[in-house]
Structure formats: structure tokens, C-alpha cells
């Protein structure tokens, strides 16, 4: 079993981008609207880790200056950012400057598209909501790679 580490700091933003490429996720929750009401769309950036790495998760939250840390289970902690202003002013600009690599880069690109659609209030129209749902369906495990 790996021991807990103390005195963890993040000095290299590229390290955080690489760590996120492997351990982070970009997602969206769509809460179905009732008739004649607006859909609720929640964008989420999160990193899950074993509880022994809770100090690392705290350092990531401190480094990005946003988000919350939750105990997910006996053995897991979650760093989550869902506040739109934190996503658009901190998280998205950070990963534009220090790019995500690999397949997760496609999820980040979709995440940015969703943030823009929401910013433009596209989710208040049926067409916009359909577009958001299509993008969501093709993110993460729903992504089909051509090849």
C-alpha cells in the first residue's frame, strides 16, 4: 500500500494538465424540463482520487482557486467544479493555456462548446437543448472514434 504524502505542492501547470488528462473528467448533466419550463444544465469538471491523496486534491483546488472537495465514499475523495463562473474564468482558460492531451482533449473541446452554448442561452430553445443533448451523448464513454 502506498503511504500518504505530506507537503504536496503543484509547481508546474503542465503537470496538472497531464494529471487531468489521465485522472480528470469533463461532463454535463441535463435535467429534463417540465413542460413550459427551462432545462437545467450543469457543467462539471472533476477529479476523483483515493482518500490517501486528499492532500493532492486540496492542492489542486488551491492551485485553481475554485471548486469543492467531497468525500465520495470511505476510500475516495472528489474535487468538483460546477460553478459556471469558475469554469469559464478559471478552469477553461487554464486548460486552453495548458492543453489536455489524448482522447480527453476531445471531451474538453466539447465541454468548451457546451459552455459557449449555455453562455448564449441556447438551452432555452428546443434546438439548442437538442444540440446540447447530442454533444453530451458523444462525450466520454459515448464517444465513437473513427478509424
State the predicted function of each range.
Residues 1-147:
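Sequence-level preference for short, compositionally simple segments enriched
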Amino acid at each position: 500500500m502506498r503511504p500518504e504524502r505530506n507537503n504536496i505542492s503543484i509547481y508546474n501547470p503542465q503537470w496538472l494538465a497531464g494529471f487531468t488528462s489521465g485522472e480528470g473528467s469533463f461532463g454535463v448533466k441535463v435535467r429534463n424540463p417540465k413542460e413550459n419550463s427551462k432545462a437545467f444544465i450543469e457543467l462539471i469538471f472533476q477529479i476523483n482520487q483515493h482518500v490517501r491523496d486528499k492532500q493532492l486534491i486540496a492542492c489542486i483546488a488551491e492551485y485553481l482557486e475554485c471548486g469543492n472537495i467531497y468525500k465520495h465514499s470511505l476510500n475516495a475523495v472528489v474535487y468538483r467544479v460546477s460553478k459556471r463562473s469558475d469554469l469559464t474564468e478559471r478552469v477553461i482558460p487554464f486548460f486552453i493555456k495548458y492543453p489536455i492531451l489524448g482522447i480527453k482533449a476531445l471531451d474538453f473541446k466539447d465541454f468548451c462548446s457546451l459552455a459557449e452554448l449555455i453562455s448564449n442561452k441556447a438551452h432555452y430553445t428546443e434546438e439548442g437543448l437538442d444540440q446540447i443533448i447530442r454533444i453530451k451523448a458523444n462525450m466520454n464513454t459515448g464517444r465513437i472514434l473513427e478509424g
